[in-house]
Amino acid sequence: MIITIDGPSGTGKSTTAKALADHLHFNYCNTGKMYRTLAYARLQSPWATLPLTKFLEEPPFSFTFATGQPLESFFNGHLLTSELTTQEVANAASELSQLPEVRAFMQDLQRRYAQLGNCVFEGRDMGSKVFPNADLKIFLTSSPEVRAQRRLKDLPEGTLSPEQLQAELVKRDAADAQRAHDPLVIPENGIVIDSSDLTIRQVLEKILALLFRNEL
């Protein structure tokens, strides 16, 4: 079974997807983390100056794919954690994700991950592009104000003000929705859940109710 959870940043995708995967004992794939890993590697010297095709042919980053284990990111063998949470990396990931060759590279990896079986994927094009035949497709949304407050908790203190972050989110939304390749859209047969006034537990309960109702 494949469940996809799409939506813009700050809607609770990652936390919800992980909670759902834990509850169902499914594998969990955070595709945003995958794009940020690529972006982090691309920002480092000398990879920043390599032609993109060469960079993707011999990437200095890697991921662990194992049943029942969280997806981990590595750069030259070094485990990446807080390095992926900076605004610089987020901005670079947004720019690189516009490129069709980057998206094709990542989508291939994501489909390979699905071979583990019983997966929850979260991202921006999981239900619309990567897994259009997923068993259940969720699209999370939330107000920009709420999303900015949530994202602030993931950033180092003093990085951005709530107003600055909200502006960044709106800018990213526009870029995601308007990109030529695999834009952020509600997938066909996707179910929209507004998480603005909901806790993660409440969102999780809504998704579980859908699963049980449809006997998936």
UniProtKB/Swiss-Prot annotation:
Coiled coil, from the record: none
Entry-linked InterPro entries: Cytidylate_kin, Cytidylate_kinase_dom, P-loop_NTPase
Residues noted as binding ATP in the record, renumbered to the chain: 7-15
Reactions catalysed, as given in the entry: CMP + ATP = CDP + ADP; dCMP + ATP = dCDP + ADP
GO molecular function: ATP binding; CMP kinase activity; dCMP kinase activity
UniProt keywords, alphabetically: ATP-binding, Cytoplasm, Kinase, Nucleotide-binding, Transferase
Main location: cytoplasm
EC number: 2.7.4.25
Enzyme superclass (EC): transferase
UniProt subcellular location: Cytoplasm
Gene3D superfamilies (alphabetical): P-loop containing nucleotide triphosphate hydrolases
NCBIfam families: cmk
HAMAP family: Cytidyl_kinase_type1 (MF_00238)
Family in the record: Belongs to the cytidylate kinase family. Type 1 subfamily.
Protein name: Cytidylate kinase
Biological classification of the source: Bacteria, Pseudomonadati, Chlamydiota, Chlamydiia, Chlamydiales
Gene giving rise to this polypeptide: cmk
